[in-house]
Amino acid sequence: MRPSKFRFSNRFTPGTRFVWHVPSALALVAVLGGCAASKTSNGAATAPNGKIVLNFWNGFTGPDGKAMEKMVGRFRKQNPNIEVRMQTIPWGTYYDKLTLALAYGGAPDVFVMHAGRLPEFQSFETLQPLGKFYAESAPAWGEKQFAPVPWRATFYGAKQYAVPLDVHPIGLYFNTKLFKEAGIIDARGEAKAPRTFEEFLDAARRMTKDTNGDGRPDQWGFVFTWQRTNWLTIAGQFGANILSPDGKKATLDSPQNLRALQLMHDLIYKHKVAPKPEGVDAWLAFRQGKVGMALEGIYMLASLEEQKGLAFAGAPAPQFGPQKAAWGGSHLLCQPKGISEEHSRAAWKLMRFLSDDSLIWARAGQVPARADLRRAPQFRSLKVQNQFATQLPFVQYEPLHPKSNAIFPLIEPGIEAVMLDIATPKAAMRDASRRVNQVLERP
């Protein structure tokens, strides 16, 4: 069989996707005797004019960065006594720089953290508890205003360390032009997104074509982009978990996980509606109109909107298994441990403002964590964001475990081995489980 013209791409589009597999300096902090934040001065800057200076770090280098700058600008105008200095650091180096700043001083007063990283950082006691601010703000501003899953992600143990800014779930992007050409339409003649696996497979088969007659498909019904989030979504729909309830053992070789991985393999080799993980860039192929469907995060919306001539829409992820599930994550707003009381209160004011103002954030391609804002007409008018937001009741995050960031580099090669047809799901996940367990057993 000749190589496919498509390949999977796990590259992160600048400013949209986020890098998880970065080397962490937290182990170095531990070797040096624990987090040094308490020994240094965080959040103590004051401008010559008497203003409180807040340093705010994030990794928003794309269109989301422009939206954040606008939100911060609005805060500055409404709070002339607070000077916010925003620094944008590419995600590829962001966590290394943040780690060093938290350990040795100079940490920002407010910083963005992905939900999956909070347990890791707080396991080294680097974050400031925010419980007193939530207590002072309740009941007008608190748990009832947020979606349950991102709200829970702000806790480590019994204490709360963050404000959830958004939720970025995976969903289905589909090419409306190819759908209409294949006759996959509703009563109004509009492209009809699949809701079930049967509908999904039927649509994928109709759109997989050899348009130039060379014996190989050059138009595909579906393509895997980020294998990790695709697998987590499908596995979640089969009721799978990555770790045992106590977080001490891997459950990657459970029947539910294996069924999900087998289904992904079958889409390539049995149903032949998706390309093998090799060839050209899979996400680029979707952007260029050569693929009918892709499961991707809401954070990729901007790259589609920038693509001239692409007719697309968004929908919830089809239900491949017996239950609804969709992978997701969140950007959280945090403060460093050891921040002064004055700066902590000013930082909280900024954090609350960004949450309150997150309809601007939504327009940049995110789903607000705030339930009241998602009900607003301005958000309802954002068609793709609104469609993806319908999944929040069953969105599933990666394990909120201190070692989550360390275990996924051990899992992803197994997923790819199955997709390349060089390992069975059982063999690949058995080996991945062994490697993950070795990490979990370490102190």
Q: Predicted segment positions?
A:
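Extracytoplasmic/periplasmic solute-binding protein
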Residues: 41-42, 156-165, 170, 180, ...
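Extracytoplasmic "Venus flytrap"/periplasmic binding protein-like
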Residues: 70, 74-146, 159-162, 181-183, ...
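Hinge/lid segment of periplasmic solute-binding proteins
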Residues: 115-171, 198-201, 224, 234, ...
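Short, polar/charged alpha-helical segment
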Residues: 61-83, 177-178, 411, 429
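Glycine-centered hinge/linker elements that transmit conformational signals in sensory
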Residues: 201-208, 246-276
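Extracytoplasmic "Venus flytrap"
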Residues: 48, 52-70, 89-91, 168, ...
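Short, low-complexity disordered leader/linker segments with a strong preference
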Residues: 1-55, 77, 382, 430, ...
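C-terminal lobe and pocket-closing loops
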Residues: 135, 300-311, 320-413, 441-442
